[in-house]
């Protein structure tokens, strides 16, 4: 049962960020297992199980990331990830763009929300076309989001793609899109309450997740 993370988890993540090499990791591998990996998997499984009960028609998969980076994509970085996460998303092809619900733990923050790792140009073009054709559903969601603790994010175009109005321009003129809540690694992070907070957040975000997920079924607009 998930009991919260601990300061030991944060200490490990700071340690691996400052000593990202095999010798240090092997000397602290048990710390990683006990304080980071096991609690992350417990949190992911319990959140996933609760959501599966709430939304039985959704076909989801839980993925808990490994700490090892892909050796083919180090790009000068160390062999270990310095922040860890789990995602809940529908099954998809390897390079298919799908949104996910996520929880992430880093040495200096924790975060949870929904969105794309990389939405891709085609997905964002579909979003703009949907806004052009029927803005009202997203207007309702945008107003609701603006009253919440969650924040819209994602790289913006230097030259706007168009003018969808003050409310929807932040959605319209992005290269990627996510909705998240960040907090300092303290307080509730170290308690079982974190699971309930993440669950409540995911339930709040479900209309946004579903809105984004259905973009895959839209026709790609003519360029």
Regions found by a protein language model. Give the residues of each.
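Structured soluble/peripheral alpha/beta segments that form catalytic or ligand/cofactor-binding pockets
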Residues: 100
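A short, structural micro-pattern
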Residues: 80-82, 97, 106-110, 171-173
């Amino acid at each position: 049962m998930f009991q919260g993370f601990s300061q030991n988890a944060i200490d490990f993540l700071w340690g691996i960020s400052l000593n990202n090499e095999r010798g240090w990791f092997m000397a602290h591998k048990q710390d990683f297992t006990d304080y980071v990996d096991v609690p992350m998997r417990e949190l992911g499984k319990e959140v996933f199980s609760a959501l599966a009960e709430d939304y039985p028609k959704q076909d989801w998969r839980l993925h808990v990331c490994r700490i090892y980076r892909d050796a083919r994509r180090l790009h000068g970085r160390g062999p270990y990830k310095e922040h860890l996460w789990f995602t809940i998303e529908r099954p998809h092809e390897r390079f298919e763009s799908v949104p996910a619900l996520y929880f992430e733990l880093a040495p200096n923050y924790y975060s949870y929300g929904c969105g794309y790792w990389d939405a891709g140009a085609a997905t964002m073009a579909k979003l703009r076309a949907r806004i052009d054709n029927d803005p009202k559903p997203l207007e309702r969601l945008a107003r609701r989001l603006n009253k919440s603790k969650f924040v819209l994010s994602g790289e913006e175009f230097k030259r706007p793609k168009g003018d969808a109005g003050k409310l929807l321009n932040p959605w319209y003129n992005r290269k990627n899109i996510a909705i998240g809540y960040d907090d300092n690694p303290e307080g509730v992070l170290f308690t079982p309450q974190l699971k309930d907070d993440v669950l409540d957040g995911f339930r709040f975000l479900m209309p946004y997740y579903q809105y984004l997920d259905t973009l895959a079924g839209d026709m790609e607009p003519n360029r």
